[in-house]
Amino acid sequence: MPLDKRQRDLPLGLSPQACFKDIVGRSVLPRIPLPELGKLYAAKLQARCLQPPPFQSLLCSHDKESYGKRFSRSDMRSWCAAATTTTTPLGALESSQKRLLIFDQSGDQTRLLQCPFPLRFPSHAAAEPVKLSELQGIEKAFKEDGEEFHKSDGTESEMHEDTEEINALLYSDDDYDDDCESDDEVMSTGHSPYPNEGVCNKRELEEIDGPCKRQKLLDKVNNISDLSSLVGTESSTQLNGSSFLKDKKLPESKTISTKEDTGSGLSNEQSKKDKIRTALKILESVVPGAKGNEALLLLDEAIDYLKLLKRDLISTEVKNQSSTTHKSPILLLKETTWGTRNLQTDKA
């Protein structure tokens, strides 16, 4: 016959056959009735309050007259009632160590089974603060873990953004790389795999040297732009010096030179604007009737004035050439006769 169904509620799912020992079966002493056993157990609990007495001592202190008697269900019930009605201090029973007892009635015999290790059953009042403290500690641990997780998420997102920007800068020429890959695949078909390894090594080296090369290219571009700006300023100053600064009467040429000497801290845009203004003023002084006009009208008038000067020069050159080559013989004779007359008057 199996044991009672309440054996399923044993702590940690232990089997009664593994964790209980048969006290009555091992003992040589005779059995005692259940009511007397319960009374003895209650008296011992009242005396000690913390630890229950070992059942071996209880079994040794029984009467020999009860040997040979069998326990019935009524005796067991009366023993349980006596054990529950005994007055014991509540705090001591709640916090005391308890051992588990099982009465096995299999067949015609009854056996008393005892757990070899004590079982602690803490009181409800003593268990609550422990649970609350444990819960508070668990909550704090969860909060700290959540904060660390959020911080790690922020750092990971920032690192992810930084890596995306770096990848966008480094691998902006993916199309060119794809073309190279297709060409390499076409070349490597039907050959040994060593060209592919060479391509991979080259690509790794390019990935490593990519930022350095790009930085060098940017530095070169900046240097070229600086040199071009310097060349442009020098050429503009040379043109101004060759065309306008030769005229010593213009006082504005002196101001331009002083500005170029002392205005090193000005920006390129401001210097360009100043140069344009000075050139417009010079054109106003050179072109007749161009004062007070706008910049576009002044430029148109200056262009027309230059065209007129060019035509006048061409016409004067043509007249001079025609006058020297087409002299009449009458004028030559007159000059000769006039010269002879002057000679005769001088002799007289």
Swiss-Prot record:
It comes from the Eukaryota. The keyword Chaperone does not apply. This is Transcription factor SAC51. Coiled coil: none annotated. Residues 179-199 are annotated as: Disordered. Its main location: nucleus. Expressed in seedlings, roots, stems, leaves, and flowers. The keyword Nucleus applies. Residues 260-309 form the bHLH domain. Belongs to the bHLH protein family. Homodimer. GO terms for molecular function: DNA binding; DNA-binding transcription factor activity; protein dimerization activity. Transcription factor. Involved in stem elongation, probably by regulating a subset of genes involved in this process.
